[in-house]
Regions:
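Surface-exposed cleft-lining segments at the edges of enzyme active sites
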Residues: 16-28
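Extended, charge-rich helix/loop segments that form flexible
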Residues: 1-17
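Charged catalytic cores and adjacent phosphate/nucleic-acid-binding surfaces used
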Residues: 9, 32, 36-50, 54-147
Length: 147
């Protein structure tokens, strides 16, 4: 909207001018705990998946702590595969998924069309990583009846 209205030139400009700390539209984040988030997801019938853990800019030590805590709190899966990802990152995330007993998911982290996101491409789970969708309930077959 702000770009269309001429108040900013790009989405990055919107964040810089209006949504950054100290700017008019900034709202300080109010975070829940990982346990609270997982409980809400479970209460609503969902499966808790840790999204794009390779993008949190954490050291291996802190990423392992996050994954261990996530699993201890009842998280079921972690994103292992992304379309824009180095092969060694996918292999490392697969190792972590197996190490912490987490299922795998795949995703593009797609927010809007752009040239560098290949939506749905190069998404595969490495061997030994079970997919989170194996937990999804399958719809029941409804028998046809004569009326």
């Amino acid at each position: 909207f702000l770009v269309d209205a001429g108040k900013a030139t790009t989405m990055a400009d919107v964040f810089k001018k209006y949504l950054a700390r100290g700017k008019t539209g900034y709202v300080p984040p109010q975070w829940c705990t990982i346990k609270q988030a997982i409980d809400v997801i479970h209460h609503s019938g969902g499966k808790a998946v840790l999204a794009h853990p390779g993008r949190y800019n954490l050291s291996a030590k802190w990423l392992k702590r996050l994954l261990a805590h996530f699993a201890e709190c009842g998280g079921e899966a972690m994103e292992v595969a992304q379309c824009q990802q180095a092969p060694n990152e996918r292999a490392q995330l697969a190792t972590y998924a197996r190490q912490y007993g987490l299922l795998g998911s795949q995703g593009s982290d797609f927010h809007q069309p752009c040239a560098w996101i290949e939506l749905g491409r190069k998404l595969w789970l490495p061997a030994g990583v079970e997919p989170v969708w194996q937990l999804w309930e399958q719809p029941q077959q409804i028998e046809e009846r004569e009326v």
